[in-house]
Amino acid sequence: MGIASHSAFRERESSPTGASLDASPRPWDKGLSGREPPRHVQVRPRSAVLNMLRRLDRIRFRGHKREDLLDLAESPNASDTECGDEIPLKTPRPSPRDSEELRDPAGPGTLIMAAGVQDFNRTEFDRLNEIKGHLEIALLEKHFLQEELRKLREETNSEMLRQELDRERQRRIELEQKMQEVLKARSEEQPAQPQQPPKGQSQASNGTGTERRSQGLASRVQKWFYERFGEYIEDFRFQPEENTVETEEPLSARRLTENMRRLKRGAKPVTNFVKNLSALSDWYSIYTSAIAFTVYMNAVWHGWAIPMFLFLAILRLSLNYLIARGWRIQWSIVPEVSEAVEPAKEDLTVSEKFQLVLDVAQKAQNLFGKMADILEKIKNLFMWVQPETTQKLYVALWAAFLASCFFPYRLVGLAVGLYAGIKFFLIDFIFKRCPRLRAKYDTPYIIWRSLPTDPQLKERAGATVSRRLQTASSRSYVSSAPAGLSKDEDAGRFHSTKKGNFHEIFNLTENERPLAVCENGWRCCLINRDRKMPTDYIRNGVLYVTENYLCFESSKSGSSKRNKVIKLMDITDIQKYKVLSVLPGSGMGIAVSTPSTQKPLVFGAMVHRDEAFETIFSQYVKITSAAASGGDS
């Protein structure tokens, strides 16, 4: 009984529709039990579980088609049950007799019901595990899709695309409005034309035909004109300029060095051209300069100067074309010196980076300083900062203007060309070999050297103010001095140092006194690189300038042996000096070279270095020019 019932239950469970299989009464079953065969029990599945399975199935296959999924052979085993669950199960209601047997615990169907419930619970547990797995898969897919969406938004930069889309929409709206305005204007122009009433049927037909032909001809002409010249007319349409903000690169030592090298390579053709011109003027190669001078003067005399320069430009471009094609053409008056290119290091230490930045900054500072000096001199020349210099240019321009008005251009061009050739090839050569002659008679050189820069103007203004203050203080001191003192005693007291009178300390004559600019001197330190002892190598003190001497008073020793007196006539070279090259800036020192010293004497740590240099240099030029004029006379 139990075995037959269990096999019948399994057959019912394996049926495709899920309905119960009611077997006909068998005689052997009746003989075994002594009564009619029992009816099978069908457990009704829960509707909540089926609804949950349907929802999970929709979640799992959301966004995908059935054809995109794996085949049944590669899909999990639970797919068959899921597909079977989509068909609603219709089970017949059990009869009252079956319900009585279910309620009877001692009945023969108890074991069958227990086995069926156990199998059903097992299948429900498997389905719950499967549901749990589907939920985990869905959550993981959701997480991965969110990550991909976030990365996709970051890569495509949706904000910028949205802004660009808004701009395009706005532009489209504006174009539509313009098109509507144009169409409206055309529609208003057409009915505005006067229409004459027809006098007759033939006249009306002829008039309409003529109007149609004229309108067709006008439209064709307009279409042809728009096709030919519409593109050019559109080019002249004014459009608002878009302000684009350029992103600035951060400061980088490697980038700064590379930019300086690029600037040097870019300026190399210009510097080579200037060097070749200077070599022609200096007659570096006698044959080349002689040929160039002869060709130039003949071209100017016959009026071929402009064609000659144009031919030289064409020749230069032709040579550049051949060089670009691979030809090795090297021609230069001055031999080129190949500079060793240091290989770029990948890893630099902190000290190397710092030194690299300092070197590049120093080169950039010097380059910018030279460019600023040139531009400031040109600006001061045209702004009448130095009237006597600008007046010469003013007179020269008036003379050139009057000459161009009264003389023919051929004669003016001939005069200018001949003067330029003689000046470039002959006069400049003589002036470069004779500096004193150039300082007296080379007018362009004198004008350019005398033009001041803005820092020099500020220094002169500051020196004038300080001189006025010192003059006022000296007048007040003299007026407050005792009446018994003579003028010489007052002057000697005023020009005395901390250790005594000025001329006694430096063993000079009484008329040697500091200039008005440096009456109190400049605090500095004397660096004598000829000495080896540290006490003699660096001395602290005060520097004075007289009419004929440069005097240094040491502040440590009372002996006058440690003081330094240099005659201005003995100075061979004087220039600004930078004691520590590591520090930024142009330095705070002055280097003075004399025949008695192997290495220049350096006066360092001077706060007013530029003022002291200008004073010493101007007094030196004054003394040397006076001596030269005295020797010539």
Curated annotation (Swiss-Prot):
Regions of compositional bias (Low complexity) in chain numbering: 190-205
Listed InterPro entries: GRAM, GRAMDC4, GRAMDC4_PH-GRAM, PH-like_dom_sf
Residue span of region Disordered: 1-46, 72-109, 182-216
Domain GRAM, residue spans: 500-578
Tagged with keyword Cytoplasm: no
Protein location: Mitochondrion membrane; Endoplasmic reticulum membrane
Membrane topology, as annotated: Multi-pass membrane protein
Annotated positions of the Phosphoserine modification: S75, S79
Ranges of compositional bias, category Basic and acidic residues: 27-39, 95-104
Residue ranges that the Swiss-Prot or TrEMBL entry lists as coiled coil: 134-190
GO CC aspect terms: endoplasmic reticulum membrane; mitochondrial membrane
GO terms (BP aspect): apoptotic process; negative regulation of toll-like receptor 9 signaling pathway; positive regulation of apoptotic process
This protein's record includes keyword Transmembrane: yes
Family matches, as PANTHER family: GRAM DOMAIN-CONTAINING PROTEIN 4
Quaternary state and interactors: Interacts with RTN4 (isoform B).
Record protein name field: GRAM domain-containing protein 4
Source organism per UniProt: Mus musculus (Mouse)
